[in-house]
């Protein structure tokens, strides 16, 4: 479900290990807080710019609506809890802003732009990729359904990320799941032996 997320946070894990070796303290809360603060701040900035530059409402109204978005408990929690929701929110709001600018200027999302947005957002959570395709559909209109665009911007990236996600699951996740399952069976068998 999160094909590139572990690779995106891997440098933060290395930094935490390095700082732990140097200081003897686990500083993961502070290390994770920095990107979360960045993503939350720029989510606010881009949602404000969507209201202001694309929807063209007044500055005060844009500020109130942006603040209202961040007053919702789900958004507040996403901004402080170390999970992928704040990252997804930033990426989707950023992609929505880009799509809005393209629609406003009468231009289309090119194949490479769609693929780049798809890989970055779907790499965090696969369902985000579908949202990028919806953005591209509204931005490009009927041209979204051109064979070249469908093949190179939709089907090929979807197949590539699916193959990568399956490889990642079989390589990193499945062996750990099997080991946990075997350990559970072994412990269950030992418990049964003790009872009899």
Where are these regions (language model features)?
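Aromatic-rich transmembrane-lumenal/periplasmic boundary elements in polytopic membrane proteins
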Residues: 1, 153-196
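Specific aromatic-rich, kink-prone transmembrane helix
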Residues: 87-104
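Loop-to-helix entry region of an early transmembrane alpha helix in multi-pass inner-membrane enzymes
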Residues: 19-42
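Membrane-interface helix-boundary motifs at transmembrane edges
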Residues: 52-60, 103-109, 139-149
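Aromatic- and kink-enriched transmembrane "portal" helix at the membrane-lumen/periplasm boundary
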Residues: 25, 29, 33, 65-90
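Transmembrane-helix signature of polytopic, membrane-embedded enzymes
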Residues: 47-71
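Membrane-interface alpha helices of multi-pass inner-membrane proteins
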Residues: 108-140, 152-158
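Short hydrophobic/aromatic helix or loop-helix immediately within or flanking a transmembrane segment
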Residues: 1-26
């Amino acid at each position: 479900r999160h094909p590139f997320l572990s690779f995106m946070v891997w440098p933060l894990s290395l930094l935490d290990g390095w700082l732990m070796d140097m200081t003897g303290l686990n500083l993961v809360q502070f290390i994770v807080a920095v990107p979360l603060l960045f993503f939350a701040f720029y989510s606010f900035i881009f949602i404000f710019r969507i209201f202001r530059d694309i929807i063209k409402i007044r500055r005060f109204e844009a500020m109130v609506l942006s603040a209202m978005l961040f007053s919702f408990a789900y958004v507040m929690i996403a901004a402080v809890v170390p999970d992928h929701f704040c990252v997804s929110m930033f990426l989707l709001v950023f992609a929505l802003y880009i799509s809005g600018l393209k629609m406003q200027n009468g231009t289309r999302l090119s194949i490479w732009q769609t693929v780049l947005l798809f890989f970055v957002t779907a790499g965090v959570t696969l369902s985000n990729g579908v949202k990028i395709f919806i953005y591209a559909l509204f931005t490009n209109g009927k041209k979204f359904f051109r064979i070249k665009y469908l093949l190179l911007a939709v089907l090929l990236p979807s197949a590539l990320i699916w193959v990568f996600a399956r490889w990642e699951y079989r390589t990193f996740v499945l062996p750990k799941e099997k080991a946990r399952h075997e350990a559970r069976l072994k412990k269950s068998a030992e418990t049964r032996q003790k009872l009899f």
